[in-house]
């Protein structure tokens, strides 16, 4: 108003923003001039500061919607599914005389596997540079018989990389817990502490970002492709999943007498029923060219949706 420069950014400017959404699938329900999309701060996931050579950047977890409310991102469906989960889980708990006062949500522990390859070797392979996986090459001398890597000592160069990654993730608020060798040669794993599903997904994205950036600084390339090499194990993203809250605990916990724990059996049967009725949707949610190449070959999970309850519950 007085011709001066704006030198501040208020909180209201961060809570909601407007971005172009014309290139995102909005269901064809907009007029040609309605190209806008909206971002909104997801306050359930903490903001963080990401350091880069250009300076410090404030990163705010957000949802991205079309002007009609259609989700244009992958965070909104998670938040909406948690809402639906809370409503239905609370409804079932009331049948057992439990009135939950705290929201019930999904919880997850995402274990991230990856390959570390020296950058000099990767630079000599255009397929690794472009596709992130080997398109040709000789078979390894062993397949599933490899055990010297998994039960061996972590190489000092890799251990230095892991320690660097862990320090950076702690600064970003990611509670990483374990780091170890994996089965295939040059394959490793990092896993965070179990946490709420929405936060676990955000932290997994941060873990993958930090792994790639840090590997370059250590003269290595981090391959996150699910199946970068044939005839040896690929890299999975094992998800330890449950539902519950601090108030009601883990609703998948069987207790001392699972056969007599009616509440546990009801929630267990709901998962079995959901898998039976919606196997196609669940399979599609993890379907991609890279993951479909991994499933069913030198791996534990098959290419179909399956469920194993263990001998005790099956009997």
Q: What is each PLM-predicted segment?
A:
Residues 1-225, 229-315:
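Glycine-rich, acidic/polar active-site loops that bind/position phosphate-bearing ligands
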